[in-house]
Amino acid sequence: MSFLVLPPEVNSALMFAGAGSGPTLAAAAAWDGLAAELGQAANSFSSATAALADTAWQGPAATAMAAAAAPYASWLSTAATRALSAVAQAKAAAAVYEAARAATVDPLLVAANRHQLVSLVLSNLFGQNAPAIAATEAAYEQLWAADVAAMVSYHSGASAVAAQLAPWAQAVRALPNPTAPALASGPAALAIPALGIGNTGIGNIFSIGNIGDYNLGNGNTGNANLGSGNTGQANLGSGNTGFFNFGSGNTANTNFGSGNLGNLNLGSGNDGNGNFGLGNIGDGNRGSGNVGSFNFGTANAGSFNVGSANHGSPNVGFANLGNNNLGIANLGNNNLGIANLGNNNIGIGLTGDNMIGIGALNSGIGNLGFGNSGNNNIGLFNSGNNNIGFFNSGDSNFGFFNSGDTNTGFGNAGFTNTGFGNAGSGNFGFGNAGNNNFGFGNSGFENMGVGNSGAYNTGSFNSGTLNTGDLNSGDFNTGWANSGDINTGGFHSGDLNTGFGSPVDQPVMNSGFGNIGTGNSGFNNSGDANSGFQNTNTGAFFIGHSGLLNSGGGQHVGISNSGTGFNTGLFNTGFNNTGIGNSATNAAFTTTSGVANSGDNSSGGFNAGNDQSGFFDG
């Protein structure tokens, strides 16, 4: 199994086991001695034959002897030089090993981290160790990344040392002996064929269009990538920008999943570091749709919350609006219980501070239901206002477990989302940490697709910008797995190419066919900086559209959008809409998401009024 996917327990143990650099240094000393012996032999042989030819041995026989002996003397000198080169390379190999071993995490440190995790988990009876567990896991991920980085450096350095070793068979061929070609035959004498086309670099096997070394895939810019369209090093996947990502469409380092923007995330669509889940904004979250850090649950807006839809820090429970609450739908601080309105209360439905007991069904006013501490709610356990549903700590939501405002769905910590588990705002889908996305698992903004950490993409797993297609880490491409820019086709690491697998920059204005303007890729686009098919950019800005048949102002993403700009999805008109068939103008830079809405700052479907969630509101 490749060291790229091995845990630090294995990589550290392998690096610290064995004989170390001692045998390599001993080999260097042996080669040094051999070089000295060969050099002395060459000098002695040359001196002896020259002395014979100049003094005692004359005539045609002496001339023939001198002619036959000269190649052997030359071969001895060449062998001595080769031996000295082997000395240098052996010492270089030892130095590479020592540097890698110094960079590798000590196995005892890895064991201590795992022991600490076990201790924290066993004593985590009430969830009090959740932040410490998250920190320990984040430290473990850093140990993993450090070991992989050390091994990648070791592999690269050792490969470079090996590449500089000259085969001894070349020296054997110089001997005046009929058997020399036979001695030089075999694997050592075979030239390694070029097992790819259009690559710039070495060791790119069965691949095209790479710039860099040892890539197994196509269209990468960087080294040791296993996949296509990556910009960076040692990525296992496609369309990544960064180092050692295990997945696709990530921007940054050491992510396990897709569409993450940040480091050490396990999941998809996270914007931050060390998250485990889907669509989180912040660091160290475990769950989905959280905005903040070290939350455990869904749609928490704050930090160190355990539960869902809490708005504040640190709460344990559901739909609490405030700080240090333990329970459900408390509005205030330091409450223990359900639907308390105030501070420091223990009980249910209490209104005021420092109270113990049971109050009204609803502590708020104008509610229809039970356990509402907010106002004008229809449903259960809402601490926000004007909600239809249950467990909402935000305002004007239609659904449940929303800590943001004006959402239609559940588990949204952002605003005006139609869907679930969105930490961003204005999304139509689920698990998006970015804004105005149509799809799921996007940490970037205004994408239509899945797992994009870039922006304005129509497609999936893009870490670049304004691409139509999938797995692009470059910008303004129409196609697949391009790490270069403004390409039409696939696997290009160069710019402005049409076709497949070119690492070269072309001296043209556009790629593709039938484009009018500058910086376009695809087919029959007009204006500047479009990707896709038959888009028309009439906006004042350089950035155009991605997708198919978009027109009007810039930055439309998807199919057949028109209007003044920033529409994402299908058949939208107006400004800043996400979804299908919306026509809101959003003059105040608000966002509308959903289906067939004409009102501003709305979510859901078929809403004509402003600031609406749900369906069919005027």
From Swiss-Prot:
Pfam families: Pentapeptide_2, PPE. Residues 1-29 form the signal peptide. GO terms for biological process: response to host immune response. Keywords: Signal. Gene3D superfamilies: PPE superfamily. Residues 598-618 are annotated as: Disordered. The keyword Lipid metabolism does not apply. InterPro entries: Mycobac_pentapep, PPE_dom, PPE_sf. The keyword DNA repair does not apply. Belongs to the mycobacterial PPE family. This is Uncharacterized PPE family protein PPE16. The lineage of its organism: Bacteria, Bacillati, Actinomycetota, Actinomycetes, Mycobacteriales.
